[in-house]
Amino acid sequence: LYSGKNSSCAIGGIKANIGHTFAASGMASLIKATLCLHHRFIPGVPQWNAPKTELLSGNELYVPVESRPWLIQPGGLKRHAAISGLGQDNVCSHLILSEVPAELRQKVEVAESGDLSLFPLMGQDMSTVRKTLADLENDLQSGKDPAALARKYYEVSKNTDAEFSAVLIGATREEILKEIAAAKSGIENSFSGKGDWSSPKGSYFTASPLSREAKVAFTYPGGFSAYVDCGRSLFQMFPGLHELDQKFLNETGPADKRRGSNYLCELLQERRLFPRTMERLSNKELDALQDDFIHSPIAMFESGVSSAVLNTHVMREGFGLEPQIAFGYSMGEISMLYGLGVWDSMSNMSDILNTSKLFSERLAGPMNAVREAWKLTENEFRNETLWGCYTIRISVSEVQKLVDKEAHVYLILINTP
């Protein structure tokens, strides 16, 4: 079970999560491992920093500092969990669990529980919106359960033709009350023509709604948009995403003789998004990992496209949103086509990316396309930066005057005012 290499097995302990349970620790560990398999989720180890030095030599294990999704790894078909226990009488026990077959698992697209509650507050005008806001405030202050209130206000929102809707979001009673306090002035300012109101938490109101007949558009940004820690809680909130992993394997089969992958964990670049280490990484170390990610264009592109597929699935299957319009830019067109199912096999994309020289030699690495265009010799600019992109915050006309004086400087993108 532990013979894999390259940090293949996560380790943790129940004591770190819930404290010392004494004689009940064995049962608590069994429950934790079972829940990990059921939810396909690896919980983080709180307050972890580093192991004792003698444990650092092995490379089979890692400690998840933050919780993360548990994806099927290359060569595997199911997940396994092991429990080791030592009783007060020094008797050791060891138990290995495996997840149930996919056909026996209950399909759940959206998790029914979570930290955040969402409150849609409807009204025909400013006074009725503010009254609904005050009603929610009174309900919370009287001790009513926030989750039950969220369900109540959601049901009300489905059966009204009110023109305006304020949406509040929060994890605790205190957070929601703070959102209400901020919304009072925000809603009034919006009705006064001072623009839409939004909070850092995600609460929102506009006095200029698009109406119920408005169409939905999906926008796909540049393909190179992934980053370390991207989408960490997505699988936990939307368990149905795990079915995509099985879908890729069933539809494409093993990628034996190809350089591409049909495993979601590899297409998503899981190990880059959620690093596996025995020690807690510093901000400087995380920045270095992100810098390496940015300079690995194939990995970055595969991860960006895969993330777009996951988020599109969430919008369509989790929220029931179907776009009437979709568009992508800066290679986001690729994400759009895969995300909306126009193209099927992402493993074929992976194979092409990993066998083509486009992102390994032509536009990245030695950048031979640039060398040929500029007629550079093989040894020129080997130890210097050959190509760089910069953002300049001055007028287009000023930039163009300077660009015209240079042989190898180009104005390639102009943002709108």
Model-derived segments and their meaning:
Residues 22-29, 93, 128, 303-311, ...:
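Catalytic-loop motifs flanking and including active-site residues across diverse enzymes
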Residues 54-57, 412-417:
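Short, intrinsically disordered, charge-balanced linker/junction segments flanking boundaries
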Residues 123, 170, 196-400:
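FabD-like malonyl-/acyl-CoA
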